[in-house]
Every structure is written in C-alpha cells, then in structure tokens.
C-alpha cells in the first residue's frame, strides 16, 4: 500500500522484476494455454541447489527474507498467477528450511507444487551431469522444463521497463499474497490427488 501511495504522490511508477514472464519457453506455454479451455492439472517443481553458505546467510531469517516461499519461490508463484489466475484455495504440505510444498487451486488450474534448495532433489540423470537446478512445469502431463535460458532474463525485463512495458505493482500483488499465506498457514495432510510426487 505504501508503494502505491508513493506512486500516487510522485506521479512515478514502481516496476518489478518478474523475469519468468519473459522466458521463451514459458511465453510459448502462455500462448498455448490461451488457446485451450478448461482447468489444467499442473505439477510444478522448482529445485535450485544452494551450498552450506545459504544456511548461514540472512536468507534463512524469515523476518529478513520472507522465508523460502518468498526468497526462492516468489517468481514461481508469479508464474502460476500469470498463467492460471488467482489462488482460490491454498494448502501447505511441507515447510522446512530446505523444502516447501503444497497445493494451490487457481482460477484455471489445480497445482501440486514443490520448492527446494536441496540439490539431492534434482533428478539423478541431471545430477550426473553436474546440474544443481531443476525447474519443471507439467500441464496435463506435458512437461516444459525451463532450467536453462535464465542468462539474459533480467536484461530483457530492464529493456521492457525502459521501453514503457514494465511489470507494475499490481502484477506482482498476487504472488506476494500467496507467498505471505504460505508462511502463516498451518500444515495440512495432503490427499493422494493433491500430493506432489516428490513428497513420496
């Protein structure tokens, strides 16, 4: 609310960096979804390995970083809102220093999600290649793997912003709302159909 007030008072805009919205694979997915009808079944997996330094940094202090759901997951929740709309129902199935997981019912999708900084969750074939990151979204069983292609995303967001096509506060609001809920909701036992496969 304060940032909106500052915008009104100064006549200037606050822009956010929502870099997954400019990822080529995800732009193609967004276009495809725009041509399809009906709610989707989605499995979103986001593993981004972090070293021991992470556990000793300010990032594990929820008061400073917002916790794992915000620090690592905010772009992941923005992606879901951008593709499928607002969250209507939210469940948290796991919340540890290294793993968050749960279920979201969005306007256009039912989403089982998993977020971790533990590289042991990277699928074995990718780990053998030395990979410590695995980002995947499966929509009705069709996977879009988007671990690669991150090099120039920030630059592209800055380019769009300077061209007057940036992402404003309203576009970031839903992801912030969901991440805040995930920090405070009590854990719930997942039903078999709402459980992310990585939870076993």
Language-model segments: residues:
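Beta-strand-loop-alpha-helix segment that lines the small-molecule cofactor/substrate pocket
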Residues: 1-18
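Beta-strand scaffold of nucleotide-dependent catalytic cores
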Residues: 41-43, 90, 111-116
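Conserved S-adenosyl-L-methionine
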Residues: 45, 87-96
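Conserved C-terminal active-site "lid" loop/helix of NAD(P)H-dependent oxidoreductases
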Residues: 153-159
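Predominantly a Rossmann-like dinucleotide-binding segment in NAD(P)-dependent oxidoreductases
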Residues: 12, 20-86
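Alpha-helical elements of Rossmann-like donor-binding domains used by nucleotide-donor carbohydrate transfer enzymes
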Residues: 2, 24, 28-31, 79, ...
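C-terminal helix-rich "cap/oligomerization" subdomain common to oxidoreductases
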Residues: 9, 159-200
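C-terminal substrate-binding/catalytic lobe of Rossmann-fold NAD(P)-dependent oxidoreductases
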Residues: 98-153
């Amino acid at each position: 609310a304060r940032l909106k007030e500052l915008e009104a008072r100064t006549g200037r805009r606050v822009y956010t960096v929502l870099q997954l919205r400019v990822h080529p694979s995800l732009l193609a997915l967004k276009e495809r979804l725009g041509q399809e009808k009906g709610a989707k079944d989605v499995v979103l997996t986001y593993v981004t390995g972090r070293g021991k330094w992470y556990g000793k940094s300010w990032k594990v202090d929820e008061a400073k970083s917002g916790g794992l759901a915000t620090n690592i997951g905010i772009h992941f929740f923005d992606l879901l809102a951008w593709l499928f709309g607002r969250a209507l129902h939210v469940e948290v199935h796991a919340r540890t220093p290294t793993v968050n997981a749960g279920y979201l019912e969005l306007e256009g999708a039912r989403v089982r999600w998993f977020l971790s900084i533990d590289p042991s969750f990277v699928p074995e074939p990718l780990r053998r290649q030395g990979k410590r990151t695995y980002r995947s979204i499966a929509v009705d069983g069709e996977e879009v793997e988007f671990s690669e292609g991150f090099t120039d995303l920030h630059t592209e967001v800055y380019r769009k912003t300077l061209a007057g096509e940036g992402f404003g506060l309203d576009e970031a609001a839903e992801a912030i709302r969901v991440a805040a809920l995930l920090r405070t909701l009590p854990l719930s036992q997942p039903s078999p159909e709402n459980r992310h496969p990585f939870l076993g």
